[in-house]
Regions:
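Short secondary-structure boundary/capping segments within folded domains
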Residues: 29-33, 41, 73
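Short HxH-centered metal-ligating active-site micro-motif
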Residues: 49-111, 118
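Exposed alpha-helical structural elements
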Residues: 15-22, 68, 101, 136
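Intrinsically disordered, compositionally biased low-complexity regions
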Residues: 1-32, 36
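Active-site or metal-binding loop neighborhoods of secreted/extracellular toxin and effector enzymes
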Residues: 110, 114-219
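Extended hydrophobic/Leu-rich segments
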Residues: 11, 17-20, 69, 73, ...
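An acidic- and aromatic-residue-enriched active-site/binding cleft used to recognize and process polar
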Residues: 31, 87-90, 119-121, 130
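Short beta-strand scaffold segments in enzyme catalytic cores
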Residues: 37-46, 114-117, 124
């Protein structure tokens, strides 16, 4: 697989719950085994659908996709549900030699990034256009993806996905003005998407799909 293409990394974690998308600042570079530099960007979000704490998710995308995502966010900043955007800097350094390929699909209805972290892990992240609850993906989490700066992060475990975990998606992100009807709709969407994701990739990995749970240390 091609490891030379430029890629960008978005991280979502769990601090901003209400009506907020945090589009991160470019703050460091990633260097892969071939010596190519890759820039990293960060986003933050809040309580995850898996409901385990403050874990993170990392999304890699190429230059074109990053620009499209930023443009989408910029074009929607004046919407009430995206009116509290802020930038967040994170002083983490990553080694990304395991990144093998990055690709993504974009249309007006969805952002669907696919990326390979190692030869054994291929993930597809679905983010619906209504980002006020679309960011509720932070517990999908990541496979092994290289070395982390452990002064910033701590690894809290490796979990194997089990189909019984699908039921944990039945909660709505805590948006104050989210009606009961909206919560039902949100939960239905998330349960459907998580079920598709987990069943698909767990099957490909012979029911051995694992994800690494990491948590940012308190400063």
């Amino acid at each position: 697989m091609d490891t030379s293409q430029e890629g960008y990394c978005f991280i979502m974690n769990s601090n901003i719950i209400e009506k907020a998308l945090i589009l991160g600042e470019k703050l460091s570079t990633l260097t892969s085994n071939d010596g190519k530099e890759r820039s990293i960007f960060f986003t933050e979000e809040s309580e995850s659908i898996m409901g385990v704490g403050t874990e993170e998710i990392i999304i890699f995308c190429d230059t074109k996709e990053k620009k499209e995502l930023e443009a989408y966010v910029d074009n929607n900043k004046k919407r009430d549900d995206l009116s509290h955007m802020h930038s967040h800097a994170l002083d983490a350094t990553f080694s990304v030699g395991d990144i093998q390929s990055v690709k993504g699909d974009w249309d007006e209805n969805k952002i669907n990034y696919q990326f390979v972290i190692t030869s054994k892990h291929l993930f597809s992240i679905f983010i619906p256009p209504d980002l006020k609850y679309g960011l509720n993906l932070s517990k999908l989490l990541i496979g092994e993806y290289g070395k982390m700066d452990m002064s910033i992060w701590k690894r809290v475990g490796v979990k194997k996905f089990k189909e019984k975990d699908l039921g944990k998606g039945k909660k709505c992100i805590n948006i104050p003005d989210c009606s009961d009807e909206q919560k039902i709709q949100h939960n239905r969407i998330w349960n459907e998407e998580f079920e598709k994701f987990f069943k698909r990739w767990n099957y490909i990995n012979n029911n051995q799909l694992e994800y690494v749970v990491v948590q940012r240390k308190n400063r």
